[in-house]
Amino acid sequence: MATEKTYPMTQEGKQKLENELEDLKTVKRKEVVERIKIARSFGDLSENSEYDAAKDEQAFVEGRITQLENMIRNAVIITDNGEESTVVTLGKTVTFKELPNGDEEAYTIVGSAEADPFEGRISNDSPIAKSLLGKQIGEKVAIQTPGGEMQVEIISVK
């Protein structure tokens, strides 16, 4: 029997997924059913673009519900006591600077289910996170990026 994939995430990330799931089940599902009902009233379904669009949206909503239920069921909560650490681990915010004279950047390393680079939350599967995980403050690390190799120094881990 195959083992199901686990989804490391913070409690906050799990709550966001649970909220999205609740919205999909209680609001979006009903909206889509109503749109299908209205589109059916237009008659011939073979050339009914409103009906096709509503059915496509229904498939998307149901697929997302299934995906969220699986992620929530297989969530592994990352516990963080909020204390500073010297080692980069999942759930920690790491600040580093590009060498030799680059700007400082900070990212929180989270599971892929709650990654949002625009919010400073990167997936533990990303090249940056993979390079930083397990490293310590003061360590110099080579990170492979699409633009080439980047040398950084870890400044802090919180």
From Swiss-Prot:
Superkingdom to which the source organism belongs: Bacteria
NCBIfam families in the record: greA (TIGR01462), PRK00226.1-2 (NF001261), PRK00226.1-4 (NF001263)
Lineage per the UniProt record: Bacteria, Bacillati, Bacillota, Bacilli, Bacillales
Species: Bacillus anthracis
Main function: Necessary for efficient RNA polymerase transcription elongation past template-encoded arresting sites. The arresting sites in DNA have the property of trapping a certain fraction of elongating RNA polymerases that pass through, resulting in locked ternary complexes. Cleavage of the nascent transcript by cleavage factors such as GreA or GreB allows the resumption of elongation from the new 3'terminus. GreA releases sequences of 2 to 3 nucleotides.
GO terms, biological process: DNA-templated transcription elongation; regulation of DNA-templated transcription elongation
Gene Ontology MF terms in the entry: DNA binding; RNA polymerase binding
Family: Belongs to the GreA/GreB family.
UniProt KW keywords: Coiled coil, DNA-binding, Transcription, Transcription regulation
Coiled coil start-end: 4-75
Official protein name in the record: Transcription elongation factor GreA
Cited InterPro entries: GreA/GreB_C_sf, TF_GreA/GreB_CS, Tscrpt_elong_fac_GreA, Tscrpt_elong_fac_GreA/B, Tscrpt_elong_fac_GreA/B_C, Tscrpt_elong_fac_GreA/B_fam, Tscrpt_elong_fac_GreA/B_N, Tscrpt_elong_fac_GreA/B_N_sf
